[in-house]
Amino acid sequence: MASIETLVEEIGKLSLTEASELVKALEEKFGVSAAPAVIAGGMAAAPAGDAAAQEEKTEFDVELKAAGANKINVIKVVRSITGLGLKEAKEVVDGAPKVVKEAVSKEEAEKIAKELKDAGAEVELK
């Protein structure tokens, strides 16, 4: 037993490259493969609803649905959020519904949505 523990300790000290070489040498020596075995029939797929419930969305898109009555203030907010020029920001607002910001954290998306709503826009997080 002591020799097995010593062997495990020595293997633990190997670098990743050395460990890879060890695996290749053992595969050749014993005629085996380190690849996982394929099970006939495979695993049962989990229902899609369960996976969606377990996995919380981490990235959100902020979509401008409509500019509302105060279009000028919405354009100003879109400019500050996106860094676009006046013409480009106006095109985004006029072309609503449009995504204003993509793949942002939940907190940032909520902050952006609040700014746009305060300016009079209709906003949706996706």
Swiss-Prot record:
| Gene name of the record | rplL
Pfam families per record: Ribosomal_L12, Ribosomal_L12_N
- Give the family, as the similarity comment puts it: Belongs to the bacterial ribosomal protein bL12 family.
**Domain of life of the source:** Bacteria
Q: How does it assemble?
A: Homodimer. Part of the ribosomal stalk of the 50S ribosomal subunit. Forms a multimeric L10(L12)X complex, where L10 forms an elongated spine to which 2 to 4 L12 dimers bind in a sequential fashion. Binds GTP-bound translation factors.
Taxonomic source organism: Prosthecochloris aestuarii (strain DSM 271 / SK 413)
Q: Which UniProt keywords apply?
A: Ribonucleoprotein, Ribosomal protein
| Role played | Forms part of the ribosomal stalk which helps the ribosome interact with GTP-bound translation factors. Is thus essential for accurate translation.
GO MF annotations, alphabetized: mRNA binding; structural constituent of ribosome
Name its GO BP terms in alphabetical order.
translation
Matching entries from HAMAP family are given as: Ribosomal_bL12
Put simply, this protein is called Large ribosomal subunit protein bL12
Q: Does the keyword Ribosomal protein apply?
A: yes
A GO CC term attached to the entry: cytosolic large ribosomal subunit
